[in-house]
Swiss-Prot record:
Gene from which the chain derives: COPT1
Methyltransferase in keyword set: no
Organism field: Oryza sativa subsp. japonica (Rice)
Keywords from the UniProt entry: Cell membrane, Copper, Copper transport, Ion transport, Membrane, Plant defense, Transmembrane, Transmembrane helix, Transport
Main location (coarse class): membrane
Main function: Involved in the transport of copper, in cooperation with SWEET11 and COPT2. Contributes to the removal of copper (Cu) from xylem, and thus to the sensitivity toward bacterial pathogens such as X.oryzae pv. oryzae (Xoo).
Annotated protein name in UniProt: Copper transporter 1
Transmembrane parts of this sequence: 55-75, 109-129
Phenotype of gene-disrupted mutants: Reduced copper transport ability, increase in copper content of the xylem, and enhanced resistance against X.oryzae pv. oryzae (Xoo) PXO99.
Membrane topology: Multi-pass membrane protein
Gene Ontology CC annotations of this record: plasma membrane
One Pfam family, short name: Ctr
Length: 161
């Protein structure tokens, strides 16, 4: 076989049973990672063996993912900035540091949520979307706040560049 000028040193392909006896045999102990959506409670979300095969822990994982999505929406809303406005008026440097800290927490929580979604569990995906919807309704669409706050959120929407 022409190897394009590369000499493989007389290497032959491994025997069929070689993978099970060494070399690639170490991969046998690795767990399978889904690369497509699957449905069911037997999964791992964020941590090894969590929630595992226990239905109650799976429900807790779904509640946790839902809460993460709501938190991301809250921290991305103008309501989070409004909470820090009094501090920023009294001490601009401290206000700036507080806003940077809130931004850092928001990005960290968003990354954690993204990692949870990488479990490719359909239930995790659905509760993450539901959490974002609930957070948007609560903090940006007027469910929690008057019409003036909704108008302010629309003017300063990060999606509108």
């Amino acid at each position: 076989m022409d190897m394009g000028g590369h000499d493989m040193g007389g290497m032959s392909p491994p025997a069929a049973g070689a993978a099970a006896q060494g070399g690639m045999g170490a991969m046998k102990s690795m767990r399978y990672t889904h690369m497509t959506f699957f449905w069911g409670k037997n999964s791992e979300v964020l941590f090894t063996m969590w929630p595992g095969t226990r239905g109650g822990m799976y429900a807790l994982a779904l509640i946790f993912v839902f809460a993460l999505a709501v938190i991301v929406e809250f921290l991305g809303s103008r309501r989070a900035d409004a909470c820090l406005a009094a501090l920023a008026r009294r001490a601009p440097a401290a206000g700036g540091l507080a806003r940077a800290a809130v931004h850092t927490v928001r990005v960290g929580v968003a990354y954690l949520l993204m990692l949870a979604l990488m479990s490719f569990n359909g239930g995790v995906f659905l509760v993450a979307v539901a959490g974002h919807a609930a957070g948007f309704l609560a903090f940006r669409a007027g469910l929690c706040g008057g019409p003036a706050q909704v108008e302010e959120d629309r003017k300063n929407d990060p999606a509108c560049c």
